[in-house]
């Protein structure tokens, strides 16, 4: 009897631990750095990866920089080669947690939570604290956030020739539809 009980308990623990992880590989992220009266500077990314540990509230988000798509190919080229230097800094990431996270309090009613952690971009890592909205429906957790960062905080230099055309306060929108990991 004990020989049967141990494997069953190990299986139950493994299943329980596996159910606390939520993942996505198709999250979306967009940014906008437009200035009034100039051409819009905006891009979207639809292959953002994220992992949420629903037991602890730990969150990790990763976006490959070359995944951002612009309305114009030339903008995309300038972004990758001149500003963000994606050949040197191929990833942007967030690693942190949801403060006071309680997975039992999640529901289909949107709730505001605070994310704290480190944002890494362009070879620079900075502490960040932003607000997000979280909901849960069946096996899905949706997490959305809107915040801004300064290009100068991450060592992103904008040439003086176009400095007036690009807002140095970049507005970022993130939307993650996280599915329970099986």
Model-found features: residue ranges?
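Low-complexity, acidic/polar, glycine-enriched regions of mature
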Residues: 18-182
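Bacterial Sec-dependent N-terminal signal peptides
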Residues: 1-21
């Amino acid at each position: 009897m004990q020989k049967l009980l141990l494997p069953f308990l190990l299986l139950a623990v493994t299943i329980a631990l596996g159910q606390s992880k939520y993942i996505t590989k198709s999250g979306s992220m967009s940014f906008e750095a437009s200035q009034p009266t100039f051409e819009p500077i905006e891009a979207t990314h639809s292959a953002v990866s994220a992992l949420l540990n629903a037991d602890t509230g730990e969150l990790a988000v990763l976006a490959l920089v070359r995944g951002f798509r612009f309305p114009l190919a030339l903008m995309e080229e300038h972004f990758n080669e001149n500003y963000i230097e994606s050949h040197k800094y191929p990833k942007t990431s967030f690693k942190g947690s949801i403060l006071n996270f309680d997975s039992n309090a999640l529901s289909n009613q949107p709730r505001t939570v605070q994310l704290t952690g480190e944002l890494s971009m362009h070879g620079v890592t900075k502490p960040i604290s932003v607000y997000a909205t979280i909901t849960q429906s069946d096996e899905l957790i949706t997490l959305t956030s809107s915040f801004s960062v300064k290009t100068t905080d991450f060592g992103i230099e904008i040439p003086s020739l176009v400095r007036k055309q690009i807002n140095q306060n970049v507005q970022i929108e993130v939307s993650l539809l996280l599915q329970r990991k099986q």
